[in-house]
Each structure stands twice: as C-alpha cells, then as structure tokens.
Design a protein with these regions (language model features):
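Short amphipathic alpha-helical segments and helix-helix/interface helices
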Residues: 2, 57-60, 116-117, 154, ...
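A short helix->loop->beta-strand "cap" motif at the edges of active sites that frequently abuts
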Residues: 7, 66, 171-175
C-alpha cells in the first residue's frame, strides 16, 4: 500500500514480545529496495529504564542508518480496541465480572471481533470469547460473530459440535445473536455457486433463522442507518424505532423472513434515499448484517436490560457513551505520542 501511494513508512516494534531489534533489522533487509521507504522506527510497549535500552537504540540506528524516533511506554488499560484477533488465539478470553454473561463464539476465522468491545464499558457484563460447550450452553447471550470465511467456520463449528451447544443455549432461554457471517450461518442454507469462499457449493446452516444466503461475486461495503421495524415492542422494549448507525462489509445476499430492521445505505451500491430490509428474528434468535450495532448506546443497554429482566433484575439506566469513552482513550494515546515521539520528524517526512 505504501509503495502504491508513494508514502513514507515508520516501522513499529512491540518490545514486550522480545527480539524487537532483530525483527526491525530483518524486516528492513528482507524488503530490499522497498526497504528504502522505511524512514524510522518506533519502539512500543517499553517497560523499564530507558538508559538501559539506549545501547540497543544506537545499534539499530547504526546498522540500518535510520533513526528511532520514539519509545512509547507500556500503557495498561488504554481502552482502545485490539488491532487484530491475536489476543483471542490463546484459548478463552474473559473480561469483566458482571451479572450478564455474554459469550462470543471464537471462530477460527473471526472478523470484526471489536464489534463487541462496547460491552466492556458496561458495569453488569462479563464478556467471554470461547469455544467451550459449557461456556456457550450457560451463557445469557451467545453471539455468532462475523467471519473471514463463513462456510469454513460453519463447517468447523459443526465438526466441534458447537451447533448443538448453541441450540442447547437457545433451548435454555439464552438470547442468540448473529452478526454478518454469523447471520448467514444462522440461516437454513448457504449457496456458493461461484465457489467464492470454498469448494462447497451448498451447505446447511444452523437453522436458527428462516433465511437463505447466496454468495455472488460482488462485495457490499457501506455505512448504514437503521431502525427496528419488525415487532419492535416484543423484540426490544425501550428503543422502538430508534435510529441506529453501523456499517456493512460482506459477500452474499440473504432472502427469506427478513425485515427486522429497515436500513438506508449511505455509500456503496444504493442511494441514501433507498430503504432496504435487513435482519431476521425467530424465537430467541436474531441476526443482522450491521456491524457496529452495539456501539449504539440505547440499543446496547436495551439488549442488556432485556437480559436483566429475564434474570429477575431491575433495568439499569443507559449512562455509558461508548463513543465518548473511545475519544477519551484516543486523547490519552495522543498525549503519549506527543510526549514520547518526535512529531517534528513525522511532519518533515510528510513534507509539512
């Protein structure tokens, strides 16, 4: 991407993993001529005495002819979303200690897993990423997330018997939520006539929703506005008809019992004035293509209060703004950068 854009590059290395200088040096050498785009280094997540690190900084600068323009200290609980799913690879991850247990099925090819970070700012939620049948079967809400390869993840989920665990959770009264690729998995069938995602042309879904999905050769990518239109009072009391914001990024189109939400696509294939149906609900399960739906504070609190009601707990007021929490976290990161990074160097390589 940097080569296509003709952009300068700063190489960032996390020192807490070990071997940071070897990693930086090796990357520059392996890139060959393209390595000339790398203008400097940032050392990230440093703990300890900077004077002890200085010989290493001098060494990498002398060996590659590029400066280290900053050493960022390790900042615990910065409050920003994880960069990728590496944090989920070491088995079960659980954060929070609330009364509402939410389990996200940790698919092998999970995507957009930060969709569920907003739950971490709620005082009554325990959020867990897991493939444990016991965790899934005893959750108050199970989320089937998006996937980079929906068909493969669906087949792997079935091979592990987690389809049975999800149904057990539903039969015990848990709410099942399916987002994007998870929404496609939750339907009756997935058709892949062009073999976009696999060599399997047709696969049975989980049968939780009355929809079928067909993969085409084009991808939907757009921001959306939405409102609940299908049985809103029964589906989610307290946010009837409220406007929601999010985005779509998926292959495939679904058909069937669709119309839980009415959406307007703000970019991509349709004009803002065009309203389209999205989402489906049946029994204790609902699903949608809308990523970022839980960043809508009133909607998120409404979902949680419905779960509290089922547990015999009083509702909580919606006093948490996820957007404001993210902005404060970004401000803290900006303060760290101003304090520990040569911003003047960055401006110079950008020609500012």
């Amino acid at each position: 991407a940097a080569k296509l854009a003709g952009a300068p590059v700063l190489l960032v290395g996390d020192i807490d993993k070990g071997g940071v200088f070897a990693s930086l040096y090796g990357t520059v050498k392996l890139l060959g001529r393209d390595g000339r785009r790398i203008k400097g280094y940032l050392i990230n997540k440093f703990r300890g005495d900077l004077d002890i690190l200085k010989p290493g900084l001098d060494m990498i600068e002398a060996a590659t002819g590029r400066p280290v323009i900053g050493v960022l200290p390790y900042a615990a609980d910065l409050g920003l979303p994880e960069e990728d799913s590496l944090s989920l690879r070491n088995g079960t991850m659980s954060r929070g200690d609330g009364t509402i247990r939410i389990v996200v099925v940790r698919l092998r090819y999970i995507s957009n897993f930060t969709d569920f970070d907003p739950f971490l700012c709620e005082p009554d939620v325990q959020l867990q990423y897991s493939v444990s049948p016991a965790d899934i079967e005893n959750a108050d809400m199970v989320i089937i997330p998006g996937s980079k390869n929906t068909v493969k993840d669906l087949l792997l989920l079935k091979d592990a018997g987690l389809d049975r665990s999800i149904r057990t959770a539903r039969d015990r009264g848990a709410r099942i939520v399916a987002i994007c690729g998870g929404y496609q998995m939750a339907g009756r069938k997935i058709y892949d006539p062009h073999f976009v995602e696999s060599t399997v042309g047709e696969v049975n879904g989980l049968g939780l929703l009355d929809i079928e999905t067909t993969f085409g050769e084009t991808k939907t990518t757009c921001q959306v506005e939405a409102k609940i239109v299908q049985r809103p009072a029964a589906f989610l009391p307290g946010v009837d008809g409220g406007e929601l914001k999010g985005y779509e990024i998926h292959m495939g189109e679904s058909r069937g019992d669709i119309g839980l939400f009415e959406i307007r696509r703000l970019s991509g294939q349709a004009l803002p004035s065009v309203s389209l149906p999205d989402g489906s609900a049946r029994d204790h399960c609902w699903g949608t293509y809308i990523h970022g739906i839980f960043e809508n504070d009133a909607f998120r609190r409404g979902v949680l209060n419905r779960l509290r009601e089922k547990k015999g707990l009083a509702p909580l007021p919606g006093s948490v703004s996820y957007t404001e929490m993210k902005e404060r976290a970004l401000d803290r990161l900006a303060d760290l950068l101003r304090l520990h990074v040569d911003i003047g160097f960055i401006r110079r390589i950008l020609g500012l």
